[in-house]
Amino acid sequence: MEARLTKEEVEVLHEQADRTFFHTHFKFLRSHKGFRPKNIHMVLGTSHGGKSTLIRSLLTDICTGAVKQNVLLWLSEETELEFLSEFYRSGINPDNVKNLHVLSELDLMERYKTPKNLLRYIEMYCGENDIGLLFFDNITTSMIYMGRSPSDQAKISIDLKKMCQLLALPFIIIAHTGAAVTDSSNRLIEMNDIRGGKSIVNLAQFFYVLQTFHCDSEIYTTIRITKHRGQEVDHRFYRLIYSRKERLYGRDELVQFKEFKEIYKRRNVL
């Protein structure tokens, strides 16, 4: 195939790159104009490191936004009821949740016993329900991925990217670090600390590392943008501010690199 685009096609690509498709109040997402259609956005963090809290925070942000989008949350570790029980504890108005769809592998595994069948069902569900954003919590504990060989995980990763392209939506995938990696490790968590195969890391266009530091009695939950394909990013370090009342990250704030280094130096180390 001839690798050439017309002038008009190039202009369309440039217009899309400059456009914000999904508005958000989170600054770390606004730094690259929000979630991008046809792009995989990976969030990596330790077990009990705040990933599910971040997902609930992002979903609340989307559900309460001015522009209503149909959103699908695909779960691997919780049932639909378990998720919703925690989600509603934030006090969100049920009227704002009408566009949220939740599917759990724990509820579906008897009907869809193979990765191929489950992926086909997720793809069909997105199409039939006009889903605009897809969240997957958590790939590394999913029946389609966990315990499979590196080659099988690589194939699944490619299938997920193909589905993202076909549905033309942002695909937000949550992943665990390996068991030996903790928030109090003597280094920063990196993309390749993901549990299992690394293929999905290479295929993702955007990558965020969630890491919490304890400095004496203070807690700093940080999110770092480590990959941002096709978008310029001026700032890569942010702190997530937790609201005990809502049990969510209510907002985030920019952290300068110098400040981030100081937080890292002051962290409690076991």
Name each model feature, range by range:
Residues 1-28, 41, 47-52, 63, ...:
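C-terminal regions of RecA-like/P-loop NTPase motor modules
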Residues 7-10, 24, 46, 66-151, ...:
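Conserved inter-motif catalytic segment of the P-loop NTP-binding fold
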Residues 29-94, 203-205:
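Walker A/P-loop NTP-binding active-site region of P-loop NTPases
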Residues 70-72, 172, 208-210:
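Short hydrophobic alpha-helical runs that function as membrane-insertion/retention elements
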Residues 73-74, 135-136, 169-177:
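Structural recognition of the conserved hydrophobic beta-strand(s) that form the central parallel beta-sheet
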Residues 139, 177, 212:
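Flexible loop residues that form catalytic
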Residues 141-143, 178-182:
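Short, active-site-adjacent cap segments at secondary-structure transitions
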Residues 150-159, 190-194:
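Charged helix-capping and loop-helix junction motifs
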